Each structure stands twice: as structure tokens, then as C-alpha cells.
Amino acid sequence: MIRIDKRSNVDLRPVKITRKYLKYPLGSVLIEMGETKVICTVSMEEKVPPFLKGTNQGWLTAEYGMLPGSTPERKVRDVVKGVINGRSQEIQRLIGRSLRAVIDFSKLGERTIWIDTDVIQADGGTRTAAITGAFVALYDALEKLKRDGVIKEIPIKEFVAAVSVGIVDGEILLDLSANEDMRAEVDMNVVMTESGKFVEIQGTAEKTPFTYEQLQQMLNLAKQGIMKLIEIQKKALGLL
């Protein structure tokens, strides 16, 4: 099929990661995946949740939100509604799980890392972009903490990134745009570490059930995309 942006079925959208995007956070990134743009910031508190007190273990938690102008129709802020909508809750928990999977909290001490992800323009794949960008911001933040003598070493076990895959008009596609996502028969988000371990797979048949063989094909394509994203992360961090 011919995609709107002329990509092949197996191509990512253009990815740009701008580090140190904001002045005040420990780490900050603007990640752009096609027309999707997400600001990811990292802050730290010198305390942990009650269940971790006295353990010398750290913690990480995440928040996710979409600015009113991030979508074609104005999106009402959760603070105005007085409640976080279910989708945002699901996504911020996913972001937290994804990043906790690659952190050695015994090396962080009793500190809490806060990840804040704010979508400033949504064109599909906001949760996967948030995970991919937040990891880079987290790496920068932990590197600064090490440089400042707050921690002895960067407690990252390995890199992690995320991407969407799906079936649109019977064809398997990587990194769906909003237009493709709306038309998808199957929509899937995959989070994976650099060593090829899955952190999360979210897959739904929106219109047509999918086969085991199609599942394997989608996971293989997602892995290819994630390995490319990890390469982009490393280049952004100056590690390649």
C-alpha cells in the first residue's frame, strides 16, 4: 500500500530527539516522530513511597498528559475535569513500568524519579514516543546525578524503546500515524529492551481478528523498529 507520508510498510517515521530542551529539569527531551511531538522531563525527590522506606531502594513513577492544542479539537485539561481519564492513567502506568524494567533501584538510594511526558502534538504513537524519549531524558538525568556525586554509578541495566505496529488494509505496518491508527484492523504497541526482552505487548483486534502468524510478523517488525530507535537514542546521547 502507499502510505500518506510515502514510507514503506517497514519504515519508521523520521525521528528527532532534542536533548536538554528545558532549563530546569534534571533531564529533558523533545522527541518528534513524524508529526507527533512529546516533551519528556525528569525530576527527583529525596524520598520514596511508604512501602520502600528503610529499604535503600529507589522508585520511578510517570505522568502523561496531552495539551489542549495537541489534537484537532481542543482537548480539555484533566485538571479542569477534576479526574485523570482512563487512557492517560493507562499510558502513564505503561511508561512507568517500561522505565522501571531497566533500572537497578538498589543503586539509586531512597529517591524517587519523576517522569513527566506532555504531548504537544498528537499524530499517532504518543505513548511509544513518550517511552522512547523519556528514556533519553532519564539517561541524561542519571548521568547528571552521577556527575554531581549524588549517585556512584548510572543505574541503567540496558536501553529500552517502544513502537507501534498494526494491520491496515490487510498489510502489516510499522509506526502507525493517526490516520493509519484510525483505519487499523489491528493495533499493537510493543516495548522492548536492547537485549530483545519484551516489557509489554498491547495488541487489539479493532475490526478483524489476527492469526498467530500475523502476530509473529508484527512482533518481528516491532523488534526491527525498536532496535533502530535504540540506535537513534544512542546517537542522540553521543554514545555512537
From Swiss-Prot:
HAMAP family (alphabetical): RNase_PH
What are the disulphide bonds in this sequence? none
Q: Which biological process, per GO, is one annotated for this protein?
A: rRNA processing
The record's listing under NCBIfam families reads: RNasePH (TIGR01966)
Question: Sorted alphabetically, which keywords does the UniProt record give?
Answer: Nucleotidyltransferase, RNA-binding, rRNA processing, Transferase, tRNA processing, tRNA-binding
Traced from the root, the source organism's taxonomic lineage reads: Bacteria, Pseudomonadati, Dictyoglomota, Dictyoglomia, Dictyoglomales
Query: Per UniProt, where does phosphate bind?
Result: R87, G125, T126, R127
Q: Which family does it belong to?
A: Belongs to the RNase PH family.
* GO MF entry, a single one: 3'-5'-RNA exonuclease activity
Offer one Pfam family short name for this entry: RNase_PH
Key word rRNA processing present: yes
User: Would I find Transferase among this entry's keywords?
Assistant: yes
Recorded hits in InterPro entries, A to Z, give: ExoRNase_PH_dom1, ExoRNase_PH_dom2, ExoRNase_PH_dom2_sf, PNPase/RNase_PH_dom_sf, Ribosomal_Su5_D2-typ_SF, RNase_PH, RNase_PH_bac-type
State the function annotated in the UniProt record: Phosphorolytic 3'-5' exoribonuclease that plays an important role in tRNA 3'-end maturation. Removes nucleotide residues following the 3'-CCA terminus of tRNAs; can also add nucleotides to the ends of RNA molecules by using nucleoside diphosphates as substrates, but this may not be physiologically important. Probably plays a role in initiation of 16S rRNA degradation (leading to ribosome degradation) during starvation.
Oligomer status and interactors:
Homohexameric ring arranged as a trimer of dimers.
Please report the name of this protein according to its UniProt entry: Ribonuclease PH
Organism of derivation: Dictyoglomus thermophilum (strain ATCC 35947 / DSM 3960 / H-6-12)
What is the E.C. number?
2.7.7.56
The reaction(s) annotated as catalysed by this protein in its Swiss-Prot or TrEMBL entry are: tRNA(n+1) + phosphate = tRNA(n) + a ribonucleoside 5'-diphosphate
